[in-house]
């Protein structure tokens, strides 16, 4: 999902040059929180520009978020087509309504009988094309309302429109039951929370996403990202030098 928040100048103003910022989204921040922070920082520095992001991260997820500004917001639709890579942890032996830590655990059960071989074998069955329904606790639309709005009213929409995704890689990296660490390489639009829920269901014990960190979007790597605070500091430093584009976290797609 991509979102662009416009800061409109006068009709005579030329659109400002833009940048693509690699930001490490903190825990419990929404992607919109990060966009708002960047947008407000530019405003305080006297620069009016569009600011948007590509690839929404849930509040309980951390990691790579690409924030586009100025003319670079035109590249968001291209960037959102890229594959994503994640590191995460699934907790087995329980489920939650949101498929992550946002809601309480339910249906607890024992997982001591599970073997590592079984975990690897089930993970392998997820590789390839598959249809995935968006979770009820998500921003997907249904009849003009977000699914999470229905969920907050206790409504369950069973005819949620499924989308086709591709799981390129699902690797179990560590097992310390009930926790299973993994790496996932998926196509655009994949809900990792749903994969965690389906993984637990396939094992017959239930499961939910206990932690998630995005490490790559296409060729863009988390290792090159800045924290929110460091990004804000870069913007202020560049403003003081009279150069608001070209920060250390700016990236330029290959041409």
UniProtKB/Swiss-Prot annotation:
Q: Where is the active site?
A: 58 (nucleophile)
Q: Which family does it belong to?
A: Belongs to the pseudouridine synthase TruB family. Type 1 subfamily.
Described purpose of this protein according to its UniProt entry: Responsible for synthesis of pseudouridine from uracil-55 in the psi GC loop of transfer RNAs.
Would the keyword Isomerase turn up in this protein's UniProt record?
A: yes
What species is this protein from? Answer: Chlorobium chlorochromatii (strain CaD3)
Reaction(s) the record says it catalyses: uridine(55) in tRNA = pseudouridine(55) in tRNA
InterPro entries recorded for this chain?
Answer: PsdUridine_synth_cat_dom_sf, PsdUridine_synth_N, tRNA_psdUridine_synth_TruB
Task: Write out the entry's keywords from A to Z.
Answer: Isomerase, tRNA processing
Keyword tRNA processing attached: yes
Record GO biological process: mRNA pseudouridine synthesis; tRNA pseudouridine synthesis
Q: Which SUPFAM superfamilies match?
A: Pseudouridine synthase
Q: What is its EC number?
A: 5.4.99.25
Gene Ontology molecular function, alphabetical? RNA binding; tRNA pseudouridine(55) synthase activity
Q: What is this protein called?
A: tRNA pseudouridine synthase B
